[in-house]
Amino acid sequence: EKLRSGQKPHWRFKLDEKIIEWNDLIKGVVKFDLKNLSDPILIREDGSFLYHLPSVIDDIEEEISHIIRGEDHISNTAFHIEIFRALKASIPNFAHHPFLTDQQGKGFGKRIGSLSIENLKNEGYENITILNYLINIGSSKDITPDTILDDVLENFDIKNISNSSAKFSDKVLKSLNSDVLKN
């Protein structure tokens, strides 16, 4: 009836009703029952693509080995894995990090621009300070004022990231920046 009325269809990816399991580099073993998801729309009625198919194709083309994203994308990962399989492509490693919160435990929304990296840089924070802080916040490691990029990256281990939300501390960031500037 919709087609007869001239309405164009959108295209969905048919999910099998099964449990998808993967070893998340932060969360550990994750199981997701696909019957709890509706078949994701890949192409809108106007022919434009939604995020999912282009994202997976880009990951395949660029030979992405690790995908690190927020824990709000766990359900996306379940059907992205199915799209990788349908395309007979290697499935990358996935890691889903917890959200960054303020000191009261409230999450930072995308619409709150005050905590953007650009704003932190404009406030005088060094690039190495921001990187060092962000890759270590919420980990079991002490945040030290490494000033050499190779040292920061060499000391990073994704296994140190906690499953719990990390609390952003302007005080710790300021102190770290001060230490970096002294070195």
Predicted regions and their residues:
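Active-site cores that bind ATP or allylic diphosphates and position pyrophosphate for catalysis
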Residues: 1-108, 116
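Catalytic adenosine-cofactor/nucleotide-binding cores of aminoacyl-tRNA synthetases and other
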Residues: 87-183
